[in-house]
Amino acid sequence: PDYGWGQGTQEDFYNIAGELRKNPRFDHIRISGGNTLNCDQALPWYNALKDRLDEGNTHQLAGSFDNFAQFFTTVREDGKHATADELHNVMEAMVGMEYGMQTGVWWGPAEYARGEFCKASHGERLAYAEHRPNWTAASVYRAPDGKVQAFGGTSERQAVTTSYRFLSKERDVFFDGHGPQREYVMELPGGEPGSYQDGQTNAEQVVSITWGDDVQPVVDGTYVLINKSSRKLLDNENGSLTSSTYSTGKKSLQWHVNPVDARIGGDFSYH
């Protein structure tokens, strides 16, 4: 339930949790609360219920960064399971993990940045930064397979445009093929300070960090797309997608692949 829609009071929630505890079917199922979309209200609800809870849970569609972070810290200090059951952006996952979140559930599709963060988060966090007034965060992880990636994200509804500078102290590296260089700036678009759902794009991104003799090139230009197995090329002749063999100068074999605009909406890691 959430308090904003008349779905019940704290007392109602407390009584329901008590009834669930009496039912043996729930012996091995975590009973969860606060469950508010406004993270400023999560702790008051959680604190009122916690002696009948196994899990503290919130998500972030309103409220302050301070209370979002403090919620997970408090739940862990109480010895309970910390959850965010409605992650709207990779930013919420990064912040949650930094302050104790143990379980997260994506709201909407787990696109590229989100999926890569899920894998990377089982590895080693190399760097983390946040801008609380702007509701943004960034991090660098080394995944279990050794892949190094930079992540950036924003609040779905409350972010302010923020730039993060990633610095390699040890070596020259390539950021999505750009390099060799020591620094890279990621700009995360948002709205005006103090605004709500005005100018927001729910922006998030993942950037590959590579070095050595075999690095990812910058993807931005005209390409032919080849099927590795058949050695056929993707052809768009007369508006119909077919496979073809290479022909010099045939325009229907040429594909323009360019980075999407950062304000496209959601994950802008794509082309």
Regions found by a protein language model. Name each.
Residues 215-271:
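Lectin-like carbohydrate-binding module/patch detector with strong preference for beta-trefoil
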Residues 4-221:
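Substrate-binding and catalytic surfaces of secreted/luminal carbohydrate-active proteins
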